[in-house]
Amino acid sequence: MAEKRAEKRKFNTDSWEPKTQVGRMVKEGTISDISYIMDKGLPLLEPEIVDVLLPDLEEQVLDVKLVQRMHKSGRRARYRATVVVGNKNGYVGVGMGKSKEVGPAIRKAIAQAKLSLIKVRVGCGSWECGCGSPHSIPFTAKGTCGSVKVELLPAPRGVGLVAGNVAKAVLGLAGVKDAWTTTYGDTRTTYNFAEATFDALNNLNFVRCLPEQKAKLGLTEGRVL
């Protein structure tokens, strides 16, 4: 189950009362770029910060399931939603939310996905291409979550996203247009599959590159446009 949410209304900044110092700085206009928050390692504790700094963020519901747990009074059922958010231009996040109703579960998952937002490195790391434009990923990356392992490989321009529907949704909203993927484990667990793909994208940020290597790979972080 993967469906895009209806176009949301523009966020009203006037009705927002920030609870953190970063939130107050964003509302005052002191911080106007989300990359500044990430580069400085400032805590991102309010989803409204993302609403203000990334108004073009898109949301996609990957899965909604009814889960149960045993209690002394009997079985208790709740809905679990998995959501991915991204602007298709270098920023992506994955979140999960639980509630007794579907709507609140999805809203919790969206808020959690916004708080987990990361910058994505894009480039052209395929030896078959070498165009130097940011259409793929700059190098191979691996990610894990539970039993699921995902390996992302750079692909030449025009190949598209060779991946399962969940990984394709995460990569697409991150701004990656061409990539090969290899998966291991129980990929039927939607959240683990999405989180493993997200972890692989995040691991791209920990690879050190020389300036000449960055130029050759066309490596770009965050916004491309």
Swiss-Prot record:
Keywords: Ribonucleoprotein, Ribosomal protein, RNA-binding, rRNA-binding. It comes from the Archaea. GO terms for molecular function: rRNA binding; structural constituent of ribosome. It holds the Pfam family Ribosomal_S5. GO terms for biological process: translation. SUPFAM superfamilies: dsRNA-binding domain-like (SSF54768), Ribosomal protein S5 domain 2-like (SSF54211). The keyword Phosphoprotein does not apply. The keyword Ribonucleoprotein applies. Residues 57-120 form the S5 DRBM domain. One of its GO terms (cellular component) is cytosolic small ribosomal subunit. Part of the 30S ribosomal subunit. Contacts protein S4. The N-terminal domain interacts with the head of the 30S subunit; the C-terminal domain interacts with the body and contacts protein S4. The interaction surface between S4 and S5 is involved in control of translational fidelity. Belongs to the universal ribosomal protein uS5 family. With S4 and S12 plays an important role in translational accuracy. PANTHER family: 40S RIBOSOMAL PROTEIN S2, RIBOSOMAL S SUBUNIT. This is Small ribosomal subunit protein uS5.
